[in-house]
Each structure stands twice: as C-alpha cells, then as structure tokens.
A protein has these predicted regions:
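H-loop/switch region of ABC-family ATPase nucleotide-binding domains
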Residues: 96-97
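Conserved catalytic motifs of ABC-family nucleotide-binding domains
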Residues: 56
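ABC-type ATPase nucleotide-binding domains, specifically the catalytic core motifs of the NBD
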Residues: 1-18, 25-29, 121
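Catalytic Walker B motif of ABC-type/P-loop ATPase nucleotide-binding domains
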Residues: 60-64
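Conserved ABC ATPase signature
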Residues: 35-39, 43
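Helical segment within the ABC ATPase nucleotide-binding domain
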Residues: 75-88
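ABC ATPase C-loop
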Residues: 52-53
C-alpha cells in the first residue's frame, strides 16, 4: 500500500505528502504494510481516495465511492470526504447511485438520463418524486 502511494507521487517530488495524506485520511494508516492485492473493496476505495489527495487537487472527483463497500465503511468514507473537503477547501464532484449518501455530501445535484441533464438544483430541495420519475425513464 505504501509503495502504491509513493508511485502516485512520481514526478511530483513530494514524498512528504504521504504523511499529509495519512493525517488527512487516517483510515490509510491501517493499510500500510499490506499488499494491495489483499485489500477489500472498501480498503481499495480508501487507497484510491488517498492517492488522489496526494496531488493536492482543487476538485476531488469520486465515481461511485460507495460501490461494493460495507455500510460501516461508507460512514467512515463519508466523514472523511466531508472533513477533507472542508479542511482543504476542495470541491467534490460525486457520481453516486445511492441518494442518501449523495444528499448528505452534496450541496447541489444534477440528474442525468441517457447522457442529458434532466434535473438539477439545490440538494436540500431535491424531491424523491423527481428522482423516481427520472429513474423510471
């Protein structure tokens, strides 16, 4: 796992950022010393987020970060994403199929169907009827 993180920094010349990523995303500390091939889906997702943070992005793009992850780990990832975005001032672009997870993290939403935007707005105003209508298209 540590080698995986170091490889993400090649060309960036900032090995000290691994320590920064471990501080920001403590779940990674428990993965150090393990082989990547034995990580669970949730652990792999945590490693992927940690790698993304190493480059200090302005936008963190997450595609289905809860896919195949145990509910207990989903809450850890959600808390970490929220905290990291706040501490680093990151914008988070989230592609997510689970509405409850997306609602808790997002300020705004866009619903797409067949490659087109079919609904958009402020998450606090998102109505279940809107989602159900577009899911049935």
């Amino acid at each position: 796992v540590e080698e995986n993180l170091r490889m993400a920094l090649l060309g960036c010349g900032r090995a000290d950022r691994i320590d920064d990523a471990l501080e920001l995303f403590p779940a990674l500390k428990g993965l150090l010393g393990r082989k990547g091939g034995v990580l669970s889906g949730g652990e792999q997702q945590q490693l992927a987020i940690g790698r993304a943070l190493l480059t200090r992005p302005k936008v963190l793009m997450l595609d289905e970060p809860t896919e195949g992850i145990q509910p207990s780990i989903v809450m850890e990832i959600e808390d970490s994403i929220r905290r990291i975005a706040s501490e680093l001032g990151l914008a988070v672009l989230l592609v997510e199929q689970y509405l409850d997870f997306a609602e808790r993290l997002a300020d705004a939403y866009v619903i797409m169907a067949k490659g087109a935007v079919v609904a958009a707005g402020v998450t606090s105003e998102l109505r279940l009827e809107t989602v159900k209508h577009h899911l049935s298209l």
